[in-house]
């Protein structure tokens, strides 16, 4: 089976808790290789553009404000069924509904400050990866 790529963002709340290493360990234990990574402080323009699909939703402004509230860790994960596998280990969007042992159950505080973002489809993964990384930044692992 071909390996997929997916985008993951460790959000400002989880970065502030210093759990990046613990989250990376979960990716690797699930068979997801990190093939690109960077820490950055998103600008308002970047966050608005990245989450443009949600622009008409009532939570858009709060989402953007949260995503620019502190640094984020952005990584590209590679592995078999990477999109689905990453979403499984992230857990439900609302941490109160997330299964025990998932990233959100263990590290998220609320549906807004929910620790991580993960691509929800191969198509969105390709778009999201291209938003943050140039092709030459992806390492072959």
From Swiss-Prot:
EC number in record: 2.7.4.6
**What GO biological process terms are annotated to this protein in UniProt?**
CTP biosynthetic process; GTP biosynthetic process; UTP biosynthetic process
Listed Pfam families: NDK
The UniProt annotation places ATP binding at: 11, 59, 87, 93, 104, 114
The positions flagged as active site in the entry are 117 (pros-phosphohistidine intermediate)
PROSITE patterns tied to this protein: NDPK, NDPK_LIKE
Q: What is its main location?
A: cytoplasm
Question: Organism's domain of life?
Answer: Bacteria
Q: Which UniProt keywords apply?
A: ATP-binding, Cytoplasm, Kinase, Magnesium, Metal-binding, Nucleotide metabolism, Nucleotide-binding, Phosphoprotein, Transferase
Give me the Gene Ontology terms describing cellular component.
cytoplasm
Where is the protein situated, by its record's location annotation? Cytoplasm
Entry keyword Cytoplasm: yes
Top EC class, one word: transferase
Substrates-to-products reaction catalysed = a 2'-deoxyribonucleoside 5'-diphosphate + ATP = a 2'-deoxyribonucleoside 5'-triphosphate + ADP; a ribonucleoside 5'-diphosphate + ATP = a ribonucleoside 5'-triphosphate + ADP
Gene3D superfamilies on file: Nucleoside diphosphate kinase-like domain (3.30.70.141)
Cofactors demanded by this protein: Mg(2+)
One Gene Ontology MF term: nucleoside diphosphate kinase activity
Q: How does it assemble?
A: Homotetramer.
Q: What does this protein do?
A: Major role in the synthesis of nucleoside triphosphates other than ATP. The ATP gamma phosphate is transferred to the NDP beta phosphate via a ping-pong mechanism, using a phosphorylated active-site intermediate.
NCBIfam families, per database record: PRK00668.1 (NF001908)
Q: What family does this belong to?
A: Belongs to the NDK family.
**Protein name, as recorded:** Nucleoside diphosphate kinase
């Amino acid at each position: 089976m071909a390996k997929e790529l997916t985008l993951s963002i460790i959000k400002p709340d989880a970065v502030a808790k210093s759990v990046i290493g613990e989250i990376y360990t979960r990716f690797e234990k699930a068979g997801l290789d990190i093939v690109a990574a960077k820490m950055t402080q998103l600008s308002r323009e970047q966050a608005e553009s990245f989450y443009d699909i949600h622009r008409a939703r009532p939570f858009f402004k709060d989402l953007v404000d949260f995503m620019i509230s502190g640094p984020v860790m952005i990584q590209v994960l590679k592995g078999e069924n990477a999109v689905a596998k990453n979403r499984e280990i992230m857990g439900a969007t609302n941490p109160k509904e997330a299964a025990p042992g998932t990233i959100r159950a263990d590290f998220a505080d609320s549906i807004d400050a929910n620790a991580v973002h993960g691509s929800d489809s191969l198509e969105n993964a390709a778009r999201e990866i291209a938003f943050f990384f140039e092709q030459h930044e992806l390492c072959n692992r």
